[in-house]
């Protein structure tokens, strides 16, 4: 049972109470202070001090100071008045117990409110930090978008300047062709004049030298007419023998039928042009060429202007949808822009057009499998991605980069199976 402490001293003013309590040699670490508006308890085993205060105090602003083996309390009164005693008198045990329980409940409520207030303040801080981070990210995103827009404007200006240069060059060539044509027409006219003049001179000479007979005059006239008309050109034929294309494949591994089919498909793809597009009337001749558009898209891809590159490939595909490299290159752009489903579609379309599989299209088929596999892996479809990588390795087993990536995908799949 703890020993009650009674050797304390206290003083007061109308607004505060000053209480001095000796610790009796007890370590400060072992001292526990509990204070509410009507109750003060100091527990420093084996001693105990309790005070059922005469009037309510402001326990939040009140304070305690420990020093020189003594605790000095400064208790601020809620109402300015002088107390008759420090503790209320005439309190029985039941009343004391009720005051203790009420004080504990008040302390618990206050602690709960403080915890909730702290949690609310923490949430506000987190909300503020999140808003600041979102603002920073938005500014960074806007900065990146501005950079992209500037690059797009720059590329557009360069493209327009290049178009203007091509237009002027084409106009210059047209003027030169017209000048040459005019010169040729002048030369032809002069030649005709000379021939006409020679014919006229020859005709006059024949008339002067010919006999006066009617029949002889007709004979010479007919002869002059025949001489004035040039003889028709002789007809000839030119034989052309084309050199057949031969694939560098060993005879035991030869795929003559497939190779011929591939060559036939390539020739058809080059001839397949869709000119029934409304926008074609505003384009120049070189802009209507899918090969030119493909090269332009490749240059834009190299400058990381992926949206402009996609636009170039789109127009090229509208002009000729049988060229597999257009789909293959557009799939690479979609991968860069994280348009993963579109990358899968374009890679699959490229693989359809790269049939039958021959040595000439092996590299393109390998790239199509790798790009589709990459898109599958970024969609976390690792099994499908591994299948494409293994297909790429069947085409090019010595490709170290594809081998390393395929091994990484296998490790991811095995790790997922172990976790499940």
UniProtKB/Swiss-Prot annotation:
Residues 7-103 are annotated as: Mediates interaction with ESR1 and STUB1. GO terms for molecular function: nuclear estrogen receptor binding. It is found in: Nucleus; Cytoplasm; Cell projection, Neuron projection; Dynein axonemal particle. PROSITE patterns: CS, TPR, TPR_REGION. Pfam families: CS. InterPro entries: CS_dom, CS_DYX1C1, Dynein_assembly_factor_4, HSP20-like_chaperone, TPR-like_helical_dom_sf, TPR_rpt. TPR repeats lie at residues 290-323, 324-357, 366-399. GO terms for cellular component: cytoplasm; cytosol; dynein axonemal particle; extracellular region; neuron projection; nucleus; plasma membrane. GO terms for biological process: cilium movement; determination of left/right symmetry; epithelial cilium movement involved in extracellular fluid movement; establishment of localization in cell; heart development; inner dynein arm assembly; learning or memory; neuron migration. SMART domains: TPR (SM00028). Keywords: Cell projection, Cytoplasm, Neurogenesis, Nucleus, Repeat, TPR repeat. The keyword Lyase does not apply. Residues 3-87 form the CS domain. Transmembrane segments: none annotated. Involved in neuronal migration during development of the cerebral neocortex. May regulate the stability and proteasomal degradation of the estrogen receptors that play an important role in neuronal differentiation, survival and plasticity. Axonemal dynein assembly factor required for ciliary motility. PANTHER family: DYNEIN ASSEMBLY FACTOR 4, AXONEMAL, DYNEIN AXONEMAL ASSEMBLY FACTOR 4. Interacts with ZMYND10. Interacts with STUB1. Interacts with ESR1 and ESR2. Interacts with DNAAF2. Interacts with CCT3, CCT4, CCT5 and CCT8. Interacts with DNAAF6/PIH1D3. This is Dynein axonemal assembly factor 4. It comes from Pan paniscus (Pygmy chimpanzee).
